[in-house]
Amino acid sequence: MPLAGAGPPGDTRGMNDNVERHSRSEDVQALLSGTLLIALGVAMFTHTGLLTGGTAGLAFLLHYATGIAFGKLFFLINLPFYWIAWRRMGRVFTFKTFAAVALLSLFTELQPHVLTFDALHPLYAAVAGGLLCGTGFLILFRHQASLGGFGIVALMLQQDRGWRAGKVQLGVDCVLVAAALFVVDPERIAYSLVGAVVLNMTLAVNHRPGRYIAM
């Protein structure tokens, strides 16, 4: 069944009629705060040489394997996912996702000018960065938005089959981390795996169907 008119992932069908919807100002606040938290987490991962997950992680691996520019790969990989989002999740979800991607790109571009780390241990970066990213994604998900890519598929599977979005994303990230063993230092891979677990367990614990029914 099309999801264009459905609530956020975790929708409980039939319980949404009397649920107060998020206002536009609340959605804007959520997009800004969610992407800023993710940008902070990404900064910690980047500073310590850790890997990211999802389509960004896949684009990263393909870049090292083929030499093709990361930006081109990331754009091409995301195209089918945005098509899926438009067809299955609706234009509102797709528009918010485009906005979230643009904001994250802006924050990560400006961030080095206002944020630096003198000392940051990779383990702390993995845990704190994972929590920041997980919380940011949670905010976006609850306002019918994502950062595209595999996250869209994870949300769709949660709607259609009841699979937790966090666990689906965790499985994807674990596969990417395993593939990265061929191009990245094993120690960094281990820390990256910790970050992936923290990020996705944050979603799995806090984004359960039926617990959150606001829209």
Stretches found by the model and what they are:
Residues 2-5, 11-215:
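Core subunits and conserved enzymes of cellular information-processing
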